[in-house]
Amino acid sequence: MSGTLMRMAGPTVVAEGLSGASLNEVVRVGEERLLGEIIRIEGDRATIQVYEETAGLALGEPVEASGEPLAVELGPGLLGSVFDGVQRPLSELAAREGDFLGRGASLPALDRTRAWEFEPAVAPGDRVEGGARLGVARAPGAPDHPVVVPPGVTGRVAEVRGGARRVDEPAVLLEGGATLALLERWPVRRPRPARRRLPPDVPFLTGQRVLDCFFPVSAGGTAVVPGGFGTGKTVLEQSLAKWAAADVVVYVGCGERGNEMSEVLDEFPRLEDPRTGGPLLARTVMIVNTSNMPVAAREASIYTGCAIAEYFRDMGRSVALMIDSTSRWAEALREISARLEEMPGEEGYPTYLASRLARFYERAGRVETLGGAEGAVTMVGAVSPPGGDLSEPVTQCSLRATGALWALSADLAHRRHYPAVDWSVSFTLEGDRLAGWFEREAGDGFGALRDEARKLLQRERELAEVAELVGTESLQDAERLVLESARLLREGFLRQSALDPADATCPPAKAFEMLRLFLEWHRRAGAAVGAGVPLRSILDTGLGARLLRLAQLPAAEVPGAAAALRADLSEALARLEAE
């Protein structure tokens, strides 16, 4: 089916003669066959958002409908790849087109020339259905890739073709003539089905103490990370990609500056995967859409990333989906809405911004897959509020749709406190659901310690305001002890060095032992001050400096060091009280 162009407004064009087309159908626009998607239908007129630059299009040029929705290719070869927002392989296009891509440039997302050794797990006569495992695809230098039956497909196996196969060649033939290849196509805007959702009672461990202990998120949960320029969003996301409990990382660079994305593309291949010792990129899929790319492709990029994440989830893997940033995605939505002449909402964003964000974040979750395995997609969405204003619409809509807020503070970043998570603003809605896991796996009493630490930090904020007015020396020793204990907690527990091998990640058991010792120091020093021991004498023991060095010890050495420090603390305080 084909129509003709009758109107153009930036990335949005209108074509007539497409009466049989459907919503979200992919079309090719103009003589250069630019990729587009139908977003509105009125009679035989279709409004299309074009995923490429529309300059040079002329009225009357043909528009050809494909009959298919916008879909991604899913199969062996995804890991380690870099795509744009509509899953065009950027490395292959750069080799063919050069540094600047021509309009209408198109290549299959997955390499059609590479051979994979298919080792089948089914035999003729077996009955298969969506989610069933067909076998494993292997290739030199690539991780094993399970091949599963796409959702909605059922039948009895008629023939199995093992051995060397390209991704588009039939590997399993079903009775009735249907064929299954190593790859499948899936519409990006349709969530992949699962057998059932599992309760969010297992944490998504990030390796960052401030997040795991104070603001945990469940596996399959959602978190929003607002932060202005220079607050460490990218460094935090790299730390999460490297150390978080995720088998696969899908990174969506949505609308960020070109130089920032260049840095990410340059740094990610050089990051070492601590699990395997190989490059981190080997278990990462990157979707790149810079701010100078067409806004329509930016709007589609997060759905592309989500469809890829759900595909790996259905293999029984834990997937971390990172979006940087949802603010740029919302700006693309705002521009498209303006081109469609829709009624604007707050700050010009469309009135359906909240529902679109909620619908997207609902695709996260820990599930039992159709094949009976357990998989999860955990979403971490960065937000770039102008001037760090958390009251702007994108941040507020994200907060309503997610389970945790990891707010980054410019003040902490300027003080070189990383991760610059502001504990006075951040929160989680899943702390109570995950408390049982931390009590079992980290240590009994973990929740009580966390609450005590929060109260200590809150008390420090109150005393800091008083100290700014009257000076620290005017405070009583008990109040100055609160300031000193909170300082030790901030510098020795909440702050982590991404460059220190022992401190870059922290298992829950180590974090529990550290937190227990920090708070024990505060309680016992407080008792000594109450008994008349001068605070200065306690600080002169040097035990505070030893507390700060706990973070630099490997996890296996922390219990022994904590026991020695606890004994020295008892001895020092007993000596001071006896004087």
UniProtKB/Swiss-Prot annotation:
Enzyme class: translocase
UniProt-annotated binding residues for ATP: 227-234
Pfam families from the UniProt entry: ATP-synt_ab, ATP-synt_ab_N, ATP-synt_ab_Xtn, ATP-synt_VA_C
GO cellular component: a single term: proton-transporting ATP synthase complex
A Gene Ontology biological process term: proton motive force-driven plasma membrane ATP synthesis
Catalyzed reaction equations: ATP + H2O + 4 H(+)(in) = ADP + phosphate + 5 H(+)(out)
Residues forming coiled coils: none
Keywords (A to Z) from UniProt: ATP synthesis, ATP-binding, Hydrogen ion transport, Ion transport, Nucleotide-binding, Translocase, Transport
Protein name per the record: V-type ATP synthase alpha chain
Protein species of origin: Anaeromyxobacter dehalogenans (strain 2CP-1 / ATCC BAA-258)
The organism's taxonomic lineage, starting at the top: Bacteria, Pseudomonadati, Myxococcota, Myxococcia, Myxococcales
